[in-house]
Each structure stands twice: as structure tokens, then as C-alpha cells.
Amino acid sequence: MSDWNPSLYLHFAAERSRPAVELLARVPLENIEYIADLGCGPGNSTALLHQRWPAARITGIDSSPAMIAEARSALPDCLFVEADIRNWQPEQALDLIFANASLQWLPDHYELFPHLVSLLSPLGVLAVQMPDNWLEPTHVLMREVAWEQNYPDRGREPLAGVHAYYDILSEAGCEVDIWRTTYYHQMPSHQAIIDWVTATGLRPWLQDLTESEQQHFLTRYHQMLEEQYPLQENGQILLAFPRLFIVARRTE
């Protein structure tokens, strides 16, 4: 896959950071020493962690060289490592693992989540936020356009679901706080929706297409978005964006 584009990702920085702020507010920890920010991106979530725990040793993990470079430039006091979340091993047990909009990209959560819990110190916390928009028009239409144009399905799998995550983490020895929130983002145009998803969910669909194929895909996608997302009275578009939140704390 081509590398992530930090500038495009940060075009909606306020909207992307808001769930991280709300997830962080539910983390029941005070004085802690070791934190990992999994899928740290350009460092916007890491900055929130550093602001709350300025004395902690924070390590940001991301597989994108471009994102890691951006994060290092923005936060020289934090450590950033280019690595796969599934394979990275901390040097010590972690008091907090923070994963904002990253774990949805990885498969087999039935193994991944217990593995992450095993990296925590006693009473440590795994805090996770994942987009839960597999059934939203933005993502359904990606699959429909690909089917129409005879391209393979490259979208991510749907999340396991609230009850499944509760059971996974309870069985891993955690107290679990889990909730789901739907945000309604004001978009000035249908093209703005495309700009949003091009930085994230649409990337796998476009990565192997030629420039002309990408344009053909996006033109059709734009047409279908217009059918699914009507304009409000003031000309804005409300983009529904559900997100799943989990705060799991080890009980020993």
C-alpha cells in the first residue's frame, strides 16, 4: 500500500481528534509512567497524552514512515517507532495502551485484544476507539462501486461488535467500559466527504488503480454520495460517523 498522507489526514484534524479527547477523558488513571500510542499517525493523539501526562514516557507506534516523520517533528519529547502494532514489543509493561482509530485496520481481534492486555501492567488500561461505519453509506458505496467496476473487495472487515469485545476483554481479565457514539460532521460538499475518506477508508480501494481508473471510481462514487446524502436547508451535509469506544482495565 502507498504511504499515508499526513497533510490530507490532518485536513480534518479537529474532527479526527475529538474522539481521542473523549476517549482520554474516560481513562481512570492519574500518575503513570509508561504509555504506548498505537497507530499514532502524525501525533495528534500523542500530543493529548503528553499534555495530560507530561512526565510519562510515551512511545508512538505507526507503520507509516510519513506519519512517523510528521509526529517526530511535532513532538520531539516523545519517542516514535515505525513498526507493526501486531509485532511490536515494549521494553516494559505499559500503564496505558491508547489506540485511537487504528485497530480497525488489523485482523483477528479475538487474538489481538488479549495480546494487548498481556502487555499491560497490573491495573493498566487499554483504551480503544474504532470507526464503526462498515454499514454507513460512505463505506457501502465503496463496495458497490468496486462491484460495478469489477474491482476486488479491498475494504476492511466489520468490527466484531459490542458484545464480542466485552466478552473478549472480560475473559482476558479486564473490567470493561464500552459505548458507541454517532457523530454528525458538517460537510460543505460531497467532495469534502470524498476528501475525508480518501485519507483513510478509501485508500485500499484506490491503491492499485491507475490514475484514470481512480478518476472513474471517484466520479461514480461522487454520484452515489449525492443520492445518499441530501443537502440541509443551509447547504451543508450531515455525515453520520459512528465510533466504538472501549476502556478496559486489568483487574490484577
Swiss-Prot record:
Family: Belongs to the methyltransferase superfamily. Tam family.
Protein name: Trans-aconitate 2-methyltransferase
Broad enzyme group: transferase
Statement: the UniProt record of this protein carries the keyword Cytoplasm: yes
EC number: 2.1.1.144
Reactions this protein catalyses: trans-aconitate + S-adenosyl-L-methionine = (E)-3-(methoxycarbonyl)pent-2-enedioate + S-adenosyl-L-homocysteine
Molecular-function annotations in GO: trans-aconitate 2-methyltransferase activity
Keyword Transport (UniProt): no
Gene3D superfamilies registered for this protein in UniProt: S-adenosyl-L-methionine-dependent methyltransferases (1.10.150.290), Vaccinia Virus protein VP39 (3.40.50.150)
GO cellular component terms, A-Z: cytoplasm
Record's subcellular location: Cytoplasm
InterPro entries found in the cross-reference section: Methyltransf_25, SAM-dependent_MTases_sf, Trans-aconitate_MeTrfase, Trans_acon_MeTrfase_C
Role this protein plays: Catalyzes the S-adenosylmethionine monomethyl esterification of trans-aconitate.
One BP annotation, GO: methylation
Lineage top rank: taxon: Bacteria
Record key words, sorted: Cytoplasm, Methyltransferase, S-adenosyl-L-methionine, Transferase
